[in-house]
Amino acid sequence: MTTKEIIEKITAWVNESICSKIKLKLPDDDMNDARYEVKFVNPAAFPLFVPAKDRMPPNVEAPIPSIAVQLLEGSDNIKNGIRTLKIRLCLSTWNPGTHPGEKQIPVENVAALGGYSYQPGDTESEKYNRTGEGWKDLYNFQDIALSQLEGEELFADIRMDMNEPITYGPFTEDGVIWDYYPYWSGWIAFTVICGVPYKKSEAVRDLLN
């Protein structure tokens, strides 16, 4: 399997198996106070990097919330025919605080899963509350990703290297955690293995003919 195929397959798997499991706030840098009408969307998955706003795919509203699937390093064991790749997922979220309409009130509904459905609270009485607790969105997102990764030895036709640990944490600079409030970022790294795409050299091909 080629490097390009691996990155594309993992990105598609992340989009389906991780991003579809959670909805997070859609950023609005022009209105991140009480004027912001809260909107939740599924994060998007991108290969290698997160595109700028003017380069978003048609079905994606904003660069964040998102996951970028990056290749950190790789190695090919030609003798054993094994390719090993270190993959990093870069998770990004946005949350400046609690907005009107964000709180959901449980209402009994026998037809709903668990016996309850949810509806917005009283938005007239709610007020915007700027907080520093938006980091919780990032770690909820991260926990979902870890749960999906740790539950699958084989995903996207690629095998997780179970002998290598899954590592994760916040992004740091000079030992200090990034602080770009109200944006929150973290990473997850893991190792995958697959077969090395084998191509006979011209010299070998001539000998075999």
Task: Please place each PLM-identified region on the residue numbering.
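Protruding loop/beta-arch "assembly-hinge" segments enriched in small, turn-prone residues
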Residues: 191-209
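Short amphipathic alpha-helical signal-transduction/dimerization elements
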Residues: 15-18, 97, 146-153
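Short, well-structured alpha-helical interface segments that form or flank functional binding sites
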Residues: 5, 64, 84, 136, ...
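Active-site-adjacent structural patch at catalytic or cofactor/ligand-binding sites
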Residues: 70-74, 78-127
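A general secondary-structure signal for short beta-strands and their flanking turns/coil
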Residues: 64, 80-86, 181-189
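Acidic-leaning, charged glycine-interspersed low-complexity segments
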Residues: 121-197
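Small/polar-rich, solvent-exposed N-terminal microdomains that initiate assembly or binding
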Residues: 1-80, 203-209
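Intrinsic-disorder/low-complexity loop/linker signature
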Residues: 31, 81, 99, 175-176
